[in-house]
């Protein structure tokens, strides 16, 4: 399939999904700590990309997708396929439509067929990989590369009280403010660093005089 995208991770651990060709790799290397080239791109700035009409693009099959919302949130999507009557899969256009419906702004296709597997530490394989032809969780194929997502601290420190405010040093911490704020409660935050929020859509937490 066409490799025209990249999943890139910066020094703060923020993930970006963007269009990228071979000539752009040097710029990506300079800007990010880690990157994985993949493709094809499904969504760019909320718009469905155009695809060739080759069978690999128009055929319904299992798909794996990673995307970023307008707020910078990463989303992982696996579409089961090739199991008639249980999972028919998706064409690339259909996968792009699903990704957009879920709220992704930029999205790229990772893998198809039995390589499309989603695993969690609590439940193991949660989708139905097609490698064994059965609608179960045992048909995952062998792959050389995985994307591993681990939980990190919401902030650099603090507990949100006036004497021990949450410490914010990067844009991930800024986004995490929404995770802790509850109605009719007071929270305290302290900026410990200048934070570049370029390209991140803002959502107000509250309004006041």
Spans of model-derived segments:
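Surface-exposed repetitive/solenoidal architectures
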Residues: 153-209
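Gly/Ser/Thr/Pro-rich low-complexity, intrinsically disordered segments
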Residues: 1-152
């Amino acid at each position: 399939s066409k490799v025209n995208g990249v999943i890139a991770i910066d020094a703060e651990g923020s993930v970006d999904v963007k269009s990228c060709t071979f000539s752009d790799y040097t710029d990506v290397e300079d800007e990010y700590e880690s990157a994985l080239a993949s493709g094809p791109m499904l969504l760019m700035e909320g718009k469905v990309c155009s695809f060739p009409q080759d069978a690999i693009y128009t055929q319904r099959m299992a798909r794996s997708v990673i995307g970023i919302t307008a707020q910078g949130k990463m989303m992982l999507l696996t579409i089961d396929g090739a199991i008639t009557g249980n999972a028919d899969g998706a064409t690339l256009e259909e996968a792009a439509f699903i990704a957009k419906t879920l709220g992704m702004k930029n999205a790229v296709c990772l893998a198809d067929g039995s390589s499309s597997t989603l695993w969690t530490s609590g439940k193991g394989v949660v989708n139905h990989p097609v490698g064994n032809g059965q609608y179960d969780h045992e048909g995952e194929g062998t792959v050389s590369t995985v994307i591993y997502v681990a939980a990190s601290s919401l902030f650099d420190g603090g507990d949100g009280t006036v004497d021990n405010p949450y410490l914010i040093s990067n844009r991930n911490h800024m986004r995490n403010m929404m995770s802790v704020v509850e109605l009719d409660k007071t929270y305290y935050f302290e900026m410990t660093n200048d934070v570049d929020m370029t390209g991140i859509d803002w959502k107000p937490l509250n309004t006041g005089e």
